C-alpha cells in the first residue's frame, strides 16, 4: 500500500488546480462497499485494472479504467491494442508497475511501461469520479473534466454494463 502514491496524486492534482477532495474511510473489499464508505454512487467509481496485452512477440502493460459498475471486455482491449490476448496482470506485476496492491490502484499511470486507457463512458456519466488513491482506506473524489485534462487517457471502448 502506498502512502507515496496518495501524496503524489494530491500534489499532482493541486499543482494542476483540479477540483478534488481526499476522503478517509474503512477499507473495503468490493467497489460497492467502498462506494458506500465514500458516500458516492457505484458508477462514479473509477475501476483501474492493470492488464497484460500480448501479441506479435511483444508484451504491453495497460491501465484500463472503467466505471465501477461496468465490467471490462478484455477481447476489446486486445483488439484496440493490436494484440492477440489480454489478461489481468499478476499481483507482483501490479505492484511493480503501480506501487500499489490490487484494489488500491488509482486511474493514473506514473510508470513509463503502463499505457493509460479509459472507456468513454467513464467521462460522461457523472460530474465527479471517485477512486482509491494508492491505499485501500483513502480515496480521491475528482471532477471528471479535470481527470480527463490531467490524466489524458487514450479513449477505448471496452466496458459493458453489468
Regions found by a protein language model. Name each.
Residues 1-162:
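Extended, low-hydrophobicity, polar/charged segments
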